[in-house]
Amino acid sequence: MHRKPKRILALLALMAGVLAACGGGGQAVPAEKVTLAMGFIPNVQFAPFYVAVEKGYFAEEGIELEFDYGWETDLLKLVGSDELQFAIASGDQVILARSQDLPVVYVMNWYRRFPVCIVSLPEAGIQEPLDLAGKRVGTPATYGASYIGWRALVDAVGLDETDVELISIGYTQVAALSEGQVDAAICYAMNEPVQMELAGQAVDTIYVADYANLVSNGLITNERSVQERAELVQGMVRAALRGLAFTLENPDEAFDISLKFVSEAASDAQTEAVSRAILARSVEFWSAEPGELGRSEPAQWAAAQEVMRQMGLVQNVEDVNAMFTNQFVVEVEP
């Protein structure tokens, strides 16, 4: 398979590394180079991983991490075939991949709350899901996490989809709302509503997670790595969890660290304000109760799979316990 990913070396300076205990003449053992496919462009929303690199958490696990950015459409196929070992992906992608016999495994939960939401302007009078009846709702696409979140929401509240005019608007939610093309739009909570609020535009937001908290982004690997490279998987999960824990406790410092990887996030005062607000909103969706950081819940997976089955995206009900594992999730200190 011919791939030209945009690879950016994430580890700027690896510390001395792991030393072999070979008497007085110990030699440095090279860290293992590992690629993490991000599925998106560089962004402050990846702060936990930037922190884990900068703080040396991956280095302490003997890992030299490389970020592979981009919009790879067959990312989970590459992980399933072991061409890539690790990726950031959402639960719906994992469910779809497993239905296609791709042996991918979700090994660390990142987003505790599903971040898809419905945004409207106050004059639309949309305060709760049932208020969407008779309205025009813009969607980026009729597939993917945004659309699955929408379907889960209308199913959860008993809203008949035929009562809503669903319009494909691409990723133009802000303009579509501001120009009155739609009454509401399906968005990501840390993106469009944040931009609009900082621009002085009041918005009303309905969070899908308040009605159907599906599985969102996490760390993905494959069955072969789980079975044959358990120590590597454990190291990846532990380092990522430490980065996440640090970011939750120190969001301002995490933002400053992120600028070493995404300098354009502070290219001017306005851009920096938006970037800081995006990270602050993201933290709200990553926060977990004590002992829950990184853990997956079977009920969320079952709910997501059922929505996808009703949509016709998957035909059979699979064992959700094969889709994820909590065996590598440990309590960490940042």
Sequence positions of predicted segments:
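Short, low-complexity disordered leader/linker segments with a strong preference
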Residues: 1-33, 331-334
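Short, glycine-/small- and polar/acidic-enriched structural segments
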Residues: 29-169, 174-179, 183-190, 205-207, ...
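Periplasmic-binding protein-like
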Residues: 110-120, 197-229, 233, 237, ...
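Phosphate/pyrophosphate-binding betaalpha-module
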Residues: 194
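Conserved C-terminal helix/tail region of periplasmic/extracytoplasmic solute-binding proteins
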Residues: 301-334
